[in-house]
Amino acid sequence: KIMTFSNLCNEIFWKSTTDYHVTDSVDAPMNNPYELKTIEYYLYLKNWIDAVQWHFEDIIRDPQIDPVEALALKRRIDKSNQDRTDLVELIDSYFLDKYKEVKPLSDATINTESPAWAIDRLSILALKIYHMQQEVERTDTTEEHRAQCQAKLNILLEQRKDLSTAIEQLLADIEAGRKYMKVYKQMKMYNDPALNPVLYAKK
């Protein structure tokens, strides 16, 4: 099997997802096995952040959660969202650098999303697939529940296959100059004191 970029992503995302679930703790330290500042390192980190955030969202949905804990958790979710966005931008900068010598064709078009935002969705899919697989493998549920989850799992696997193909097509188009990358800085307003009214009112 040729190691395409999407294959690399899926492999690393799956490793990170399964590594996270060894402890299944939002406070567990991350042991990133890849060399610092490599694209592999950032892909592993990306999925780890997504896995932690997935479980933050589970915890905060608990109706019995203590309000003080909920507020502290909300702040951690905000920080996690910011980290996630920063990392997506960093992954896009990898592609911008990789394809900087490519001259777009005169009729080149722009894609609706940058490569890294598509890769972001691929990372979330790894988590969805993992959790759906857990449901399929449960022995304390009905056969009907397992069958429903298996049907959902099949759709998620098909979605991952299609999204991986679309990412490969996009990267091939960028490389050939048929498409060009344009990255807009994501303005995450809730963390920026200059942009969030509640924060700048406190100055």
Please tell me what each predicted stretch does.
Residues I2-K203:
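Anionic, Ser/Thr-rich low-complexity intrinsically disordered regions
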